[in-house]
Amino acid sequence: MIRILVSNDDGVNAPGIKALTEALVEIANVMTVAPDRNCSGASNSLTLTNPLRINRLDNGYISVHGTPTDCVHLAIRELCDGEPDMVVSGINAGANMGDDTLYSGTVAAAMEGRFLGFPAVAISLNGREFKHYQSAAVYARRIVQGLLLHPLASDQILNINVPDLPLDEIKGIRVTRLGARHKAEGIVRTKDPAGREIFWLGPPGLEQDATEGTDFHAVANGYVSITPLTVDLTAYRQLSVLQNWVDKI
């Protein structure tokens, strides 16, 4: 049976990772390794100045006092009994679309899996109430099975966003590009109980590019979006432009 490594950024006790693990154990041997706390927004950060401590839980999951990227790196390099066939991250409580992907620990966990040489998928549930993790879990299993039967090029990560709808209300799957958001809203300034000044980052901006073909548009219209992402951040179309600029300075 195939081996799948599951991780997330919401933490080892989050309902999304439980739904994902339970869906995938029907088709694979699953190892679940996730942060011991919520690490939303951790992006691709690694812990380099402190040791990583683990805790083996009664349900078989392993919690790590580290980031999502730490979890995947540690699991593949040390904790897994043999290499996984795939890394699946999620199910995130909240969408990871457009610019969100730059900050997302969910996407970063998948990216670390891909960076280490394995097919990788990130899956997130759009919405505010998060009632339908099972819908996302069904699509996660379907897409993972599809990857096993029909492998894709190994240089991509599949970023999946699922509308928070009952399964029978989801219209299907659309292949999308990343949309874009407006700038995040302002900083919230307040004081702690001792009267010291503290700051909270404001909520993300509203959609700026949610046109047809984007992940925002697909999910808003009841479809699951799948966006291929790459680890290589090179802006290839700008190479010749940059070379011309360098030649002038």
UniProtKB/Swiss-Prot annotation:
Keywords: Cytoplasm, Hydrolase, Metal-binding, Nucleotide-binding. A divalent metal cation binds at residues 9-10, 40, 92. Its EC number is 3.1.3.5. GO terms for molecular function: 3'-nucleotidase activity; 5'-nucleotidase activity; exopolyphosphatase activity; metal ion binding; nucleotide binding. Its main location: cytoplasm. It is an enzyme of class 3 (hydrolase). One of its GO terms (cellular component) is cytoplasm. It is found in: Cytoplasm. Belongs to the SurE nucleotidase family. Nucleotidase that shows phosphatase activity on nucleoside 5'-monophosphates. This is 5'-nucleotidase SurE.
